[in-house]
Every structure is written in C-alpha cells, then in structure tokens.
C-alpha cells in the first residue's frame, strides 16, 4: 500500500450520504460538473461560499491543508482548482471534503466529481 493512500473512512461516507446540503446548492454543483457551459455561476457560488465561511480545515484526499484555501477557476478547461496561494500548488477538482467551522459546529461539505459522488 502506497504511503500516499489511506483506507477510506466508511463512517465519513455514511455521514456524507446523510447530509441535507444546508450551505451549498447541490443541484447547481452537479450541473456545473456535468455541463461545462454552465459551470461559471456554480463555480463562483462555491468560491464565494468557501471564502465567506472562512474555512478552518480543508481535507483534499489524500492531501490535507490546514490553512485558508484559495480557489482558482479555469474557464478554458471548466475546472476548479484549490491551492495554497492563488493557483500555486493546485489540486485538480476531483474528490474534496471541506470541513467548515460554523457557529461552533463542524459541517462537512462534499462536492461531486463528474464520475462519482462522495
């Protein structure tokens, strides 16, 4: 087993499946992923929400960033990139778990990739 991989947490999967998406428009995110021509508004929505909520702990599997995250929108490729410094150390938009500290409670927000939802 590679050092970069770790067992998938089934409890996390179960928790995600029970979410009612209180902070993001779930359908809008799915539209963004399935139709690149409609991605811009959904991408801006995600970017604005992440900025507004002041994310404390970001987990991008298998990498973990415990600091504020910048979101870069690549309009030509129709993808979102998350990085430490305005596009530096970019991570492709594939499988992302965002933990947000909101009103002293931890909210787990997930984003679907074009192939699977996590």
Predicted regions mapped to residue ranges:
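Ribonuclease/tRNase effector modules and their secretory precursors
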Residues: 1-118
């Amino acid at each position: 087993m590679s050092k970069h991989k770790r067992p998938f947490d089934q409890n996390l999967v179960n928790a995600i499946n029970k979410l009612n998406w209180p902070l993001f428009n779930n359908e809008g995110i799915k539209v963004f992923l399935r139709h690149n021509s409609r991605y811009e508004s959904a991408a801006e929505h995600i970017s604005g929400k992440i900025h507004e909520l002041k994310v404390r702990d970001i987990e991008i599997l298998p990498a973990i960033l415990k600091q504020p995250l910048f979101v870069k929108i690549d309009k030509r490729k129709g993808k979102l990139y998350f990085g430490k410094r305005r596009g530096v150390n970019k991570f492709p938009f594939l499988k992302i778990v965002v933990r947000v500290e909101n009103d002293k409670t931890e909210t787990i927000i997930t984003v679907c990739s074009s192939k699977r939802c996590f």
